[in-house]
């Protein structure tokens, strides 16, 4: 009878591994379908915008032959369905065309902007989650204390203020009146080292980074902090925490090693949701602080009817959200084994 157990366990391991592969493949398929849907919506939306985008590059003063050649160069003479499939092919091959206003390659414009956006967003979200998890852990451990009540009120007040209001107030008080921080941009004129690492650790860059980071952190801090607090309260009533206390372990070790470690799973689940909101907020923050990222590029391009840049910016922001959601889904699959064999 016992001889059959190893085969049964091996069979279970194989089925579990297959379920993980199926789950990952399913998520990859959903992500690809979502990206295709977004690309299609962007193609249609930018061609339904009011105004004539071709007026930016095709002057009415040109004769008909010159205008026709310009339309052919930009592929605007083709039927809409042909333009759509060319658009999809160009997306895959990274041939995103040229800007209608500057004639630069769209890919070259946005690669530079992409890293600027990722840098600001990464610093803002890392700070948000680091503070939120740490404070939320202590709030849950000391429920009903002054920190619990005070941090809850302050975080909810900060979250209720839109990021553009917070950003403008910070600029008025700390930049214009007190002259403590720059009013915008990533660096002072003529003060940008060639090496990326030297630049991001320079005092000038960090000085420009402070206000946008405070704006992002202030707006999104309440979510991870309050979820960590509530998750801690649930975990603190569990048997293994009570057992750790009964063993006489130090309170700090019980809080961090036994309670907080298990409470973190709830925070991981909301990361992808918060990321989606953060992408939308990034557009506002970059516009308020003149941060040269994709959000600002998208706003400027939409205002100029430069739809090659605008739709590529939208798409790149969507790709960031989709990829990060995929990473979180897969990591959650490993963190919570119930997902592997679940629906």
Regions found by a protein language model. Name each.
Residues 28, 70, 77-96, 106, ...:
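Hydrophobic alpha-helical segments of integral membrane proteins
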Residues 14-17, 77-133:
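An internal, D/E-rich "acidic patch" concept
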Residues 148-171:
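Pore- or pathway-lining transmembrane helices of multi-pass membrane proteins that form conduits
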Residues 49, 158-161, 279:
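Transmembrane helix irregularities
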Residues 19-23, 110, 114-147, 163, ...:
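Alpha-helical transmembrane segments of integral membrane proteins
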Residues 16-45:
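Charged, compositionally biased N-terminal leader segments and the immediate start
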């Amino acid at each position: 009878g016992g001889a059959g157990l190893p085969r049964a366990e091996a069979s279970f391991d194989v089925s579990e591994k297959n379920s993980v592969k199926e789950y990952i493949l399913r998520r990859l398929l959903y992500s690809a379908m979502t990206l295709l849907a977004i690309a299609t919506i962007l193609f249609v939306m930018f061609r339904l915008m009011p105004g004539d985008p071709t007026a930016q590059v095709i002057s009415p003063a040109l004769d008909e032959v010159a205008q026709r050649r310009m339309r052919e160069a930009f592929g605007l003479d083709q039927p809409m369905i042909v333009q759509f499939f060319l658009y999809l092919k160009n997306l895959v091959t990274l041939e995103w065309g040229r800007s209608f206003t500057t004639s630069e390659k769209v890919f070259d414009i946005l690669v530079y902007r992409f890293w600027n956006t990722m840098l600001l967003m990464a610093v803002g979200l890392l700070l948000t989650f680091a503070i939120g998890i740490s404070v939320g852990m202590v709030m849950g451990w000391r429920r009903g204390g002054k920190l619990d009540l005070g941090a809850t009120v302050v975080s909810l007040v900060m979250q209720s203020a839109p990021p553009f209001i917070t950003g403008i107030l910070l600029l008025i008080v700390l930049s214009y009146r007190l002259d403590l921080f720059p009013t915008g941009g990533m660096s002072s004129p003529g003060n940008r080292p060639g090496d990326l690492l030297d630049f991001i650790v320079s005092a000038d860059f960090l000085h420009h980074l402070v206000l946008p980071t405070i704006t992002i952190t202030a707006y999104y801090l309440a979510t991870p902090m309050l979820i960590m607090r509530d998750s801690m309260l649930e975990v603190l009533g569990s048997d293994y925490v009570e057992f750790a206390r009964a063993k006489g372990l130090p309170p700090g070790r019980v809080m961090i090693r036994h309670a907080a470690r298990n409470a973190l799973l709830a925070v991981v689940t909301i990361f992808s949701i918060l990321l989606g909101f953060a992408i939308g907020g990034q557009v506002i923050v970059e516009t308020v602080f003149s941060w040269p990222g994709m959000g600002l590029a998208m706003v400027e391009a939409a205002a100029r009817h430069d739809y090659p840049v605008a739709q590529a910016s939208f798409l790149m922001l969507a790709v960031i959200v989709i990829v990060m959601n995929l990473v979180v889904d897969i990591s959650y699959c490993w963190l919570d084994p119930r997902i592997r064999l679940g629906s």
